[in-house]
From Swiss-Prot:
Designated name of the protein: Probable peptidoglycan glycosyltransferase FtsW
Upper classification of the organism: Bacteria, Pseudomonadati, Pseudomonadota, Gammaproteobacteria, Oceanospirillales
Source organism: Hahella chejuensis (strain KCTC 2396)
Catalytic reactions of this protein: [GlcNAc-(1->4)-Mur2Ac(oyl-L-Ala-gamma-D-Glu-L-Lys-D-Ala-D-Ala)](n)-di-trans,octa-cis-undecaprenyl diphosphate + beta-D-GlcNAc-(1->4)-Mur2Ac(oyl-L-Ala-gamma-D-Glu-L-Lys-D-Ala-D-Ala)-di-trans,octa-cis-undecaprenyl diphosphate = [GlcNAc-(1->4)-Mur2Ac(oyl-L-Ala-gamma-D-Glu-L-Lys-D-Ala-D-Ala)](n+1)-di-trans,octa-cis-undecaprenyl diphosphate + di-trans,octa-cis-undecaprenyl diphosphate + H(+)
Keyword vocabulary terms for this entry: Cell cycle, Cell division, Cell inner membrane, Cell membrane, Cell shape, Cell wall biogenesis/degradation, Glycosyltransferase, Membrane, Peptidoglycan synthesis, Transferase, Transmembrane, Transmembrane helix
Subcellular location, principal: membrane
Xref: InterPro entries: Cell_cycle_FtsW-rel_CS, FtsW, FtsW/RodA
């Protein structure tokens, strides 16, 4: 494993960080800062009279995310394991609080944010990480029950259904899909019987399909997705403008800062559709770079989780799988929406899009994966050294 080893001088504790994981995350964050600045300059100047308004806010959120990441790196994964019930309460607490009038903040018809003055906290961003950690803890504590009985298999799904209900009340269908994919993926990776997983998968797909057509605005988005040009000035407007951005970018792009679509043509150019601006300004080559960096990030996330599983650190492994699936699922959906492969959904691109809660939580997830990788390496080293200690003891006798 390509790694960077850090040593704390006071207690001589070492921490080994996975370099490809860390490097890909830093590269995505740096590109995100540049592209958010480029995509938001004209919008910020028109809305606030300050061209760099969103750049400074994004940089502040990024630094806050790095600070949170440093704290998370110092926390043993055992702490998360012990606090799993508390984290579930926190998740449910945020999802309930955002629905209380006067606490939740409504934007574009959705009540997803809790306003704390200078920052708006998106409840679903916190809830999905807490739920992934709780699910990892449950799988470790009840692994035989999950694998051996329908009731043990159903228990975490009941918690997921409660969270899903609260997310639908906001509504936040995108966060629901990402969270559901992560939890279902964690259950599959725990070794559950294939027949049960197939039944669960069919239930989830059916539920998502039913929810997608149950509300007029979701159905409208779905029909617009199939043929956005049929209603390019209404329901298909956002997607057609994104596709125009991709078409203008061609191979190498129109150049950094030279996007036309960000000039009030493409809504949410610095948030949900920043990838379309990347494609326009940096072209196909720049878009592929983003995809490759996400591929490296997700590969290393799954890799360090697998190493933890081989080292017998099951909670670390399942938590790593869950966090990686959260990042990967959200990135995949965002890229699919931007390219017209999936219906339009309000999800940010992790580590790149503007958004305080999303950026900080993404940094937290990366820090958790780095900590998992560090503990996994320590576990492997302990296993390798233990026979040698035993042999030395025998020689002394």
């Amino acid at each position: 494993m390509s790694a960077l080893t850090l040593t704390a001088s006071k207690n001589t504790q070492t921490m080994t960080l996975d370099l490809p994981l860390l490097g890909s995350a830093l590269a995505l964050a740096a590109i995100g800062l540049i592209m958010v600045t480029s995509a938001s300059v004209d919008f910020a100047d028109d809305a606030n009279g300050q061209a760099l308004y969103y750049m400074w806010r994004h940089l502040t959120y990024l630094l806050a995310g790095v600070a949170v990441g440093f704290v998370i790196l110092r926390l043993p994964l055992e702490w998360w394991h012990k606090q799993s019930w508390l984290l579930l309460v926190v998740a449910l607490g945020f999802l309930v609080a955002v629905l209380i009038p006067g606490i939740g903040r409504t934007v574009n018809g959705s009540t997803r944010w809790i306003s704390l003055g200078v920052i708006n906290i998106q409840a679903s961003e916190i809830a999905k990480v807490c739920l992934a950690i709780y699910t990892a803890s449950y799988l470790v504590r009840r692994l035989d029950e999950v694998r051996g009985s329908w009731w043990g298999f159903a228990k975490p799904l009941l918690v997921l259904m409660l969270v899903a209900l609260l997310l639908l009340m906001e509504p936040d269908f995108g966060a629901l899909v990402v969270t559901m994919c992560a939890v279902v993926g964690m259950i599959f990776l725990s070794g559950v019987a294939l027949s049960r997983f197939a039944a669960l998968l069919m239930f989830c797909v059916g539920s998502v399909a039913l929810l997608a057509v149950s509300q007029p605005y979701r159905l409208k988005r779905l029909t617009a997705y199939t043929d956005p040009w049929a209603d390019q000035f209404d329901s298909g407007y956002q997607l057609t403008q994104a596709l125009i951005a991709f078409g203008r970018g061609e191979w190498s792009g129109v150049g950094l800062g030279n996007s036309v679509q960000k000039l009030f043509y493409l809504p949410e150019a610095h948030t949900d559709f920043v990838f379309a601006i990347i494609a326009e300004e940096l072209g196909l080559l720049g878009s592929l770079l983003i995809i490759v960096l996400f591929g490296v990030l997700l590969w290393r996330g799954m890799y360090v989780s697998r190493v933890a599983e081989r080292a017998g650190q099951l909670f670390n492994a399942y938590a790593g799988y869950g966090v990686t699936l959260l990042l990967g699922g959200q990135a995949l959906i965002n890229l699919g929406v931007n390219t017209g492969l999936l219906p339009t959904k309000g999800l940010t691109l992790p580590l790149i899009s503007y958004g305080g809660s999303s950026l900080i939580i993404s940094c937290l997830c990366v820090a958790i994966l780095l900590r998992i990788g560090s503990e996994a390496v320590s576990g492997e080293q302990t296993e390798d050294e233990s026979p040698k200690v035993k042999n030395r003891g025998g020689a002394q006798r």
